[in-house]
Amino acid sequence: MAFVIVANLDDLEPGETLFVEELREPICLVRLDDDDVRAVHNTCTHQQQPLHEGTVQDDDTLVCASHNSRFDLTTGESVGIPVVPPLPVYACKIEGDAILVDIDQQLNDAPIPHHPYH
């Protein structure tokens, strides 16, 4: 699969998340600032909760709303406590007003988490 359009920039303000379910895996888009959007798997590796319900932090991490698992949005690594397995991070780019993701370009070697809600 190549890059596909999953959202428009207008759909996502800086500091917000957006659930994308059109791809074969559930994706959480995170807009860090005007020209930086990240794409991670939408399933927390701690208790399999949806990450788009979490909060974006100033240090470019995402905190799960359920149990406060925290993930680095660049590496997918768990930060702090509880220490949990890493989160898959996917290739994401902005072209014009479009946000594109390539689900086949995983940027780390994290295993794909089980996602019971999808």
Which positions does each model-derived feature cover?
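N-terminal pre-ligand scaffold of iron-sulfur
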Residues: 1-57, 89-118
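Mid-chain, well-packed structural core segment of small domains
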Residues: 56-90
